[in-house]
């Protein structure tokens, strides 16, 4: 690619799936290739995330405008990068240096990531290869390329659904599936069965930000698990054998003054009591993964959680690690968690996203490529999951087009490359 340069960069403000502004960028190369990328946005965010630059003008999209980030792309970033030779890591590094802050608060992680991913997409066209192959090539993960086992968010709570439960996500994992099409079908059939179960119990079937049902359940945080198990059986699958359950507790959202304040019950639990609770859930339900089971600042609690349950299930750090290699390395050194959620916009560039995945994989941590609750129709994470061989993907429910876009892209990738196998990190369970 040494003869190809960046010819033009242009950004604009568009809307995400919540109707909030976000950044879209186009990158044009000297050979005529072009790439476009859209950046998502989170609702429950870790304190260590790279900064999403917002305008703060209450008279313009209630302060959520991204015109400053757009201007940063169209002026500062464009001026720096136009006529530069195409090299993903070098270009990402130039933007990081131009920003000059630890959390990308000068230019905005939303500005940098939009250009980073748009450049990657333009580069794939210049190299005449699929996006996932380009990602694998620059990451050195070609031998790991595979289709990811989906985590399908069928019931929403917490910050994604007005606190109808304290826990944020209840997900299906179709662990008996042998290919991605079958995995998606199993999830869709169970999702539709769950709608029938909810209607029979007179629960509403409106959906939350990520497309999962969000009823105000009466049985507390455990009831969605009962409902999901019933739906799995209703869809003619075997609970725990065909389809298992994953949960995102998002506990940083209700961690206050050293305790876990449950809004639904009014109780406050200690770290030890939360761990006991999870242990009880494992005995009753086929749970294979718990994300953010304790808060991002509760490192001592996380050590105990990992010690007690780390050999029984996947313990995922999201707010804990925020796709940051420094925090991940700390977790590895201190034996905290055994898996990391990968969100490109938490760190703000493709190169740094790759670094987090590679470090995790080398250290024996599971990796899960993830969307955000405020999404777009951009399907880049499907390609990142395949190219980096993350083994798992978390991209919402079986409703809402911005979620389905990623599932559809995975099926297209599978059709185009029949040699890619569906990864199943839980096959041995």
How would you name each of these model-derived features?
Residues 1-22:
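Short, Gly/Pro- and small/polar-rich lid/capping loops
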Residues 48, 140-141, 145-208:
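Mobile "lid/hinge" segments at catalytic clefts and subdomain interfaces of large enzymes
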Residues 222-429:
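Catalytic core of soluble alpha/beta enzymes
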